[in-house]
């Protein structure tokens, strides 16, 4: 699933057999590298509160989960149409990452990147998990278009989630779907103490918050 020519990665020893028939170990390496750079760019705000080293440690910890994403992604890709089961692999790893450590780190779920996007309305049917699966399925379909085989399946993997998202939008915000309205004002409180366990202090943060309905 690497849409670049061999010569582009030859200098890194990633061309040839490793690129066309990657091992689970190679997939884990790709997954970790992608995850590390992703979280290093995504989480610098954490460093503003806890310092640079805890921020880097958190990014590395989050990237460790991508080892499983890459390794199992390579394994399922060996099946016929196995790449299209990859969204379930991604979702499973995302669930574990959202549960541990420190009570989970769900702020980096893929679904949050689809807010106001064409797939966001799917959350009304299956929550952020369905949005994540649909997003990864579209991505797999786009990559699979570069392959000579299974292009019809690839097109279906792109069109079906997008079509489902458009259908879901129809039922969002309609009068028939609205029971009542409420105006809410909220002031979010801070954590009692700094540190990487801030996600475990949910109840304390709620107690320090002011919510008016």
Predicted features, each with a name:
Residues 170-210:
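Soluble catalytic regions of membrane-associated enzymes that act on cell-envelope
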Residues 1-175, 206, 211:
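Membrane-embedded alpha-helical bundles of multi-pass enzymes
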């Amino acid at each position: 699933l690497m849409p670049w020519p061999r010569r582009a990665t030859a200098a890194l020893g990633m061309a040839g057999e490793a690129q066309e028939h990657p091992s689970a170990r190679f997939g884990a390496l790709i997954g970790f590298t992608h995850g590390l750079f992703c979280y290093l760019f995504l989480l610098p705000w954490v460093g503003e509160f806890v310092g640079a080293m805890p921020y880097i440690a958190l990014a590395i910890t989050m990237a460790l989960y991508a080892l499983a994403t890459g390794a199992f992604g390579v394994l399922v890709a060996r099946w016929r149409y196995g790449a299209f089961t990859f969204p379930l692999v991604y979702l499973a790893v995302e669930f574990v990452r959202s549960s541990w450590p420190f009570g989970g780190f769900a702020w980096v779920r893929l679904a949050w990147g689809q807010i106001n996007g064409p797939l966001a309305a799917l959350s009304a049917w299956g929550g952020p998990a369905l949005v994540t699966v649909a997003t990864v399925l579209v991505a797999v379909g786009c990559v699979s278009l570069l392959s000579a085989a299974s292009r019809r399946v690839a097109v279906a993997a792109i069109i079906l989630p997008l079509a489902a998202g458009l259908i879901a939008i129809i039922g969002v915000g309609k009068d028939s779907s609205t029971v009542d309205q409420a105006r809410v004002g909220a002031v979010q409180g801070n954590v009692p103490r700094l540190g990487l366990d801030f996600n475990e202090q949910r109840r304390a943060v709620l107690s320090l918050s002011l919510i008016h309905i």
